[in-house]
């Protein structure tokens, strides 16, 4: 196993980039440590069998990577980014608009969006739910319907928060 030096890790990962989705067990704090022990070079194909938020693979930034996960909505979300369906500007506009509705209508609006997502599986709605649900959970019932409750923060999507998400 090839181990990177501390200086190589610091040069490669000056700042850990936070992904747009919250997930349980996110490895943000472990990225520098993982980078130290994971040899990623031009010949490396990074394989991430349990993608989760993708924070490790995205920060290591290999030339070639295979990301997988059992959560199809997670995969569809990142595919939508990859194919240009989801953009930073589009997500900003969507989250600001939906955030204003959440602020005025509260939990009822959250559950309306949750029902809409369960019918359409729109990646914009997936992002909204992930950031406004209880504790950033991703949970689906046996019918494969998103069933996480509302996080009870009607003013969730402040401009600063939206900027953090889309950057």
List the model feature ranges, each with a label.
Residues 63-167:
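Class I S-adenosyl-L-methionine-dependent methyltransferase module
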Residues 2-50, 55-56, 60:
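S-adenosyl-L-methionine
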């Amino acid at each position: 196993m090839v181990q990177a030096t501390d200086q190589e890790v610091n040069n490669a990962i000056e700042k850990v980039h936070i992904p747009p989705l919250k997930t349980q067990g996110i490895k943000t704090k472990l990225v520098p440590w993982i980078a130290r022990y994971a040899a990623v070079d031009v010949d490396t194909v990074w394989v991430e069998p349990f993608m989760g938020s993708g924070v490790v693979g995205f920060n290591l930034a290999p030339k070639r990577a295979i990301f997988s996960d059992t959560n199809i909505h997670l995969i569809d979300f990142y595919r939508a980014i990859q194919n240009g369906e989801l953009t930073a500007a589009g997500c900003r506009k969507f989250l600001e608009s939906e955030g204003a509705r959440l602020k005025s209508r509260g939990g009822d609006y959250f559950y309306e969006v949750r029902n809409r997502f369960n019918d359409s599986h729109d990646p914009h709605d997936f992002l909204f739910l992930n950031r406004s649900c209880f504790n950033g959970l991703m949970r689906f019932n046996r019918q494969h319907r998103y069933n996480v409750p509302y996080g009870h923060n009607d003013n969730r999507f402040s401009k600063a928060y939206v900027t953090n998400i889309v950057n």
